[in-house]
């Protein structure tokens, strides 16, 4: 019974993902075939996590005989009502998600809660912009159709007397079910579980949007919903910052911080290899680089004196994640809640590595290859 409910939830979400792809993919920038299959595959795993989470209450009802979904008529009605509520909520979330993406080209996230601050204005905008009545009718029809399908596939399930009557049979069923559900929620065979950052596996912007599950993404962004940039304040400070950074074409309207340089490359000169080694837990203040007169780090000092030493590189706070973020983007990590590398709302960043267009990149990480959104 629970398996059929989970499969129904999974089927509905898969169909909606395909609809999302067909509706919102740009014909001028189609997603590559490999990225499409990878996004669909990851999306299926995210959908399975949600489906299993929604199916767990039905699974737990099996422990209570008076409301068992198979052995009790009351349990059947209760589970049917629960499935109807879940389907209504599921389809409503996806309807809001589709509208949110059509409006902002972003999947539903926790920043959408700001629209509730002035509910009257938001409701008026929705009423004037979207086919609310038609959409509501379609929503009700989809819920009704889903429930008819659910009743059809579960209606012939009958209790089997004596099934799993022995204690070791029941124990085996419980253990197997537990590990199957746990594996589905974990998401992959690795030390780390399936995370939101796995969806952003490609530089193609739409692939990450397609792979994301709006329900999971909404909850993953809840901790960052109150953190945003202040455009009026940034515009007021722009002249000072543009002068400080040496912006050659200042534009206070677009807030352009780009600095353009022209280099005269020697004809026939090959691009050099660039090797970056990041030392974690390195006490730089004890080294000669920071002025220690005891010659505590002679080899490192030699690398700096005979190579390129960027003495202005500075991270405002301690921590590996903040240092990596600042190195990769050139932007100080001032995230108040955890670190910027774990904020799903700011994954679209230009990185220094992107500037090496003619280079082939190799990454050797002494840890997880799926570390936050640095991947």
Regions found by a protein language model. Name each.
Residues 1-230:
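Transmembrane and membrane-interface helices of multi-pass
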Residues 190-375:
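Soluble catalytic regions of membrane-associated enzymes that act on cell-envelope
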């Amino acid at each position: 019974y629970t398996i059929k409910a989970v499969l129904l939830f999974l089927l509905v979400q898969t169909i909606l993902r395909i609809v999302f792809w067909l509706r919102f993919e740009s014909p001028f920038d189609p997603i590559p075939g490999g990225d499409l299959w990878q996004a669909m595959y990851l999306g299926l795993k995210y959908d399975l996590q949600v489906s299993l989470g929604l199916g767990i209450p039905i699974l737990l009802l099996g422990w209570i005989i008076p409301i068992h979904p198979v052995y009790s008529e009351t349990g059947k009605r209760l589970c049917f009502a629960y499935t109807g509520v879940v389907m209504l909520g599921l389809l409503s979330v996806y309807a809001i998600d589709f509208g949110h993406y059509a409006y902002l080209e972003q999947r539903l996230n926790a920043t959408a809660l700001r629209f509730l601050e002035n509910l009257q204005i938001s409701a008026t905008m929705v009423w004037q912009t979207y086919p609310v009545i038609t959409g509501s009718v379609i929503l009700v029809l989809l819920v009704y159709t889903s429930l008819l399908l659910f009743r059809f596939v579960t209606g012939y399930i009958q209790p089997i007397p004596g099934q799993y009557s022995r204690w070791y049979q029941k124990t085996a069923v419980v253990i197997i079910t537990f590990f199957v559900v746990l594996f589905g929620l974990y998401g992959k065979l690795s030390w780390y579980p399936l995370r939101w950052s796995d969806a952003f596996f490609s530089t193609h912007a739409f692939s990450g949007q397609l792979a994301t599950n709006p329900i999971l993404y909404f909850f993953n962004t809840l901790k960052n919903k109150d953190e945003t940039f202040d455009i009026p304040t940034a515009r007021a400070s722009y002249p000072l910052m543009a002068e400080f950074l040496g912006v050659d074409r200042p534009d206070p309207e677009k807030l352009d911080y780009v600095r353009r340089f022209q280099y005269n490359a020697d004809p026939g000169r090959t691009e050099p290899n660039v090797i970056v080694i990041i030392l974690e837990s390195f006490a730089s203040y004890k080294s000669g680089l920071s002025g220690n007169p005891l010659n505590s780090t002679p080899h490192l000092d030699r690398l700096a004196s005979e190579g390129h030493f960027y003495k202005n590189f500075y991270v405002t706070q301690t921590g590996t994640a903040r240092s990596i973020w600042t190195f990769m983007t050139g932007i100080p990590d001032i995230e108040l809640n955890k670190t910027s590398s774990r904020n799903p709302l700011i994954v679209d960043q230009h990185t220094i590595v992107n500037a090496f267009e003619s280079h082939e990149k190799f990454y050797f990480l002494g840890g997880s290859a799926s570390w936050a959104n640095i991947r």
